[in-house]
């Protein structure tokens, strides 16, 4: 999947603080994914976007792989308030 096919559900905002650091925010139906180059933090209504509470670990891992495919890089994903952490 490429960026063009998901641009209608994702908003990307880059806020350079200097030449080495940046932030990007991806919006999935009420869920905010923010990362700083090392960690992704998920906040918002996770149920609406990924239904993590009812997902099996395999399903949740598959969704995290979807996120990884979008980002095109390897990141640690910390799912806040759900107690799921996946190292991609």
Give the role of each language-model region.
Residues 1, 35-40, 64-69:
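Intrinsically disordered, low-complexity boundary segments flanking structured domains
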Residues 1-6, 86-88:
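Short, Lys/Arg-enriched, disordered terminal segments
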Residues 4-48:
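Short aromatic-glycine-(Arg/Gly/Cys) micro-motifs in beta-strand/loop hairpins
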Residues 48-88:
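Short, mixed-charge low-complexity intrinsically disordered segments
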